[in-house]
Amino acid sequence: MNGTSPVARSKRKEPPQYSSDGRLAKHHRTNGDIDMSSADANTPTEDFDGHYEEEPRHVLPLAPGADTAEWQATIENVVRNVVSIRFCQTCSFDTDPALTSEATGFVVDAERGYILTNRHVVGSGPFWGYCIFDNHEEVDAYPVYRDPVHDFGILKFDPKAIKYMPVAALPLRPDLARVGIEIRVVGNDAGEKLSILSGVISRLDRNAPEYGDGYSDFNTCYYQASAAASGGSSGSPVVNKDGFAVALQAGGRADGASTDYFLPLDRPLRALKCLQEGKPITRGDIQCQFVLKPFDECRRLGLTPEWEAQVRKAFPKETNMLVAEIILPEGPSHKKLEEGDVLIKVNGKLLTQFIPLEETLDSSVGQTVKLMLLRGGEEVEVEIEVGDLHQITPDRFVSVSGGSFHNLSYQQARLYGVACKGVYVCEAGGSFRFDNNENGWIIQSIDQKETPDLDTFIEVMKGIPDKARVVITYKHLRDMHTLHTTVIYVDRHWAKKMKLAVRNDKTGLWDFSNLSDALPAVAPVPRKASFIQLENTSHPAVADLVKSFVHVSVTMPVKLDGFPKNRKWGMGLVIDAEKGLVIISRAIVPYDLCDITITIADSIVVEGKVVFLHPLQNYAVIQYDPKLVDAPVRSAKLSSEMISQGASTYFIGYNRIGRIVHTATTVTEMFAVTIPANSGAPRYRAVNVDAITVDTNLSGQCGSGVLVAQDGTVQALWLTYLGERNPSSHRDEEYHLGLATPTLLPVISQLQQGITPKLRLLSCEFRAIQMSQARIMGVSEEWIQKVSLVNTAHHQLFLVTKRTYERNEPAGDHLKEGDILLTLNNQLITKISELDVMYSHDYLDAVIVRNTKELHIKLPTVAADDAETDHAISFCGAILHRPHLAVRQQISKLFSEVYVSARTRGSPAYQYGLAPTNFVTHVNGKRTPDLKSFLDAVVGIPDNTYFRLKCMTFDSVPWVVTMKKNEHYFPTTELIKDPSEPLTGWRRITYEGGKKIEGEGHEGVGVAVLGEDQGEGGEGDVDGCC
């Protein structure tokens, strides 16, 4: 890269865009640049020099009449050869994240069906896509070559599939590129089907642009022009007036300048000829990056006047020389070349450009080349063995325990200046989710065994049983000085197979094979431990409460119910040590398709399972095996008396780093809380519950804890409540509030007796109103006086603000929105906790005010058994299940029982715009009212064929999407809750080729549908394949 060159950015397409609330606004998708980060498309990505990347410009095609007749004839011929490429990179690999995008290519061999485009389009990993010709004929395309370094790749299609237009090839003429020639860039600019942009080549000798942390080209020069191309133009032909392709559009600046960068066609032309002749495309390299530097810089590096004179005489028009920039440790050039060496000769020939250097290296794989250099003015001659670039370019990866791995690539090694070796984590999920980084980790060792390469890593993982906890050491490419050491939980039960994917350049697919099934878990053994002592407290009973807290870590392998995270942790309170019952927030344990790890006394680690999920009050009860715990765990004593406003209490909490903090404090308020609903993707939230706040700053720092009396009696739980997503920061709001213990006692009592609580619910949400409002709405003075006498702390009644849609609503009277509730079973309702009477009654006698009239009605309640998800389907990368309770709380009508909860990036669902919060009502015109009918309809669809889905958005807008099925990377999978399953409690069924397979299938990456932590990501969008 030139010293004065500004930062360049690739112009790549981003996935379909949706309205700010995450729901599909229209079924017409807009286009822009690919967001290369894992964050939401609205979040700016930061350049490596600290500046924010700007949105791409939307430019107009060349105005009619601006071209001569000669240009018009040329353009008419060229556009027939240009295709729009729509593609998915189906999973993260090397420098490329899983994504869906559009780009451009052009036919370079009509007889064999070869299309030239960019390497960042073809990608280094699994690719799935198709091309659309000028007459809108569509044909599948697959990669047959992607260059290890340079930004070009070649796709293959079946020419016989194009029936309605003649297919011609665009000749490649790299020799015709000249400074000052007028050119046209013909392609899919800014997502348009066809745009024609004009420009003039201004430079032929700029260094390859750097695109930051992702893929970047190097060891080649680039051309520069002012054409103002934009997203989607990647892979466009750069043609001259005679209709020859003289360069390939690759990238450009995104800071407002209309500067574009073109790849010379010398190396693409050589690769094409090799394919046409059936010869291998040899690629040689010495693991050294060279850059072009002008003579004045070379002089400062040691270029002598004598050699400068010889070079200028041999190349009169030359102004640059090649200088060593980056030399990889342990590579062929290590200890032979040094940074700043000026290259003079290769094999005795004077040389100043990349092309002759590459010609020499590509023809010398496995042989030795002799380089002559100037180092600080001294002549140095070295012999270096030329390596095979294909050998240091990964063409396989392994998926195990939720993560994906391959050998470190030359691209990554060059970017970070490290040795080209090691096991690279390309998808840091499941057991290998380190911090918040999705990739970039290098595994150093697992289970005290070093893992220098992928083969060793595979053998080590084969020997680790399911549910084992092993020590792992790793580094990040950005900081190879720091060695991280931690203990991971090896999950081999959600995805039992260790799968190897190997690139097949003949078919364009990646072939999957099973390397090994999981070893059975080792039976746990009892452990002994003691608790810490809580210091500096004058109340021993309060101090003993630390023996009732346990650390709970939850991992969710599949994203359900709109929940934005795939792992959470918090502190749970032991409510029955003999039975191992623990109570914890539902913001930590949102559903029971999960792995729960409970740590007792910071020492004993045991498994947990979900035994109860409260549908409204934001708590879950989990259980561990107490026989495995030899520690003085104490059951917390829960108060049966309601704590009151102004009462003195003791706050014990755990802060964000898991440290215990405590202080004496006062209850400041008790109120009926309304947790805002998330408009983007409905997910669990607390409803119809009283909340407590206290007068201490520690309460806002702690997501778990208790309020406790001096005698050690727990008066309230301190819980995390999941709220809405902030539209500005794209982060999920969390509220820290107290929940009084008397509310919990009926459920806990049943659980202690071994009874699973069967709750009943009123299908509505209430909001507190003041007496001034109640009077206007028709509440009589008599009732207002009763309220003032019954509840002296809060003069309030409750208004129905929202009805929950019930699938099978019982007959009888029902509350309506706007009703004011006065009594239930003859009890005046002035506290939200008094609604708890509904949990144990099939019917309730109620007095309400409706439309200013007082009514006596008999209210039926509904069973809460229907509140949790127990069946899910993964289809074409979309996760579908019945609309969960949060959906029914926010919607007035269910359009079907097939609800899109999430989707995988790089999948057909993402490519064709099947978004979370959509309902699928028909498949190919056939009604699909439930999951069974949907599954019956889609299983019979042949692979790689189109089908129609009729959908309804959350906001009742009908639309139709056409999708193409892909079973190879995204097999149809069914997850069914089954208590008889000993490991997970869920049964997995896979459908491949119309066959039903118990467990995992042969195809697809062997990891569950793992989502990123959605702190800044798109709601409902997850990474990886299933």
From Swiss-Prot:
Region (Serine protease): 82-272
Active site: H120 (charge relay system), D151 (charge relay system), S233 (charge relay system)
Span list, region Disordered: 1-51
Disulfide pattern: none
SUPFAM superfamilies the record matches: PDZ domain-like (SSF50156), Trypsin-like serine proteases (SSF50494)
Gene3D superfamilies found in the cross-reference section: 2.30.42.10, 2.40.10.120
Enzyme category, top tier: hydrolase
GO CC annotations, alphabetized: nucleus
One Gene Ontology biological process: apoptotic process
Keywords, alphabetical: Apoptosis, Hydrolase, Nucleus, Protease, Repeat, Serine protease
Domain PDZ: 305-377, 883-955
GO molecular function terms attached to this record: serine-type endopeptidase activity
Superkingdom as given in the UniProt entry: Eukaryota
EC number(s) reported in the record: 3.4.21.-
Compartments where located: Nucleus
One matching Pfam family: Trypsin_2
Annotated coiled-coil segments of the chain: none
UniProt record similarity statement: Belongs to the peptidase S1C family.
Protein task: Nuclear serine protease which mediates apoptosis.
Name of the featured protein: Pro-apoptotic serine protease nma111
Originating species: Neurospora crassa (strain ATCC 24698 / 74-OR23-1A / CBS 708.71 / DSM 1257 / FGSC 987)
Gene name linked to the record: nma111
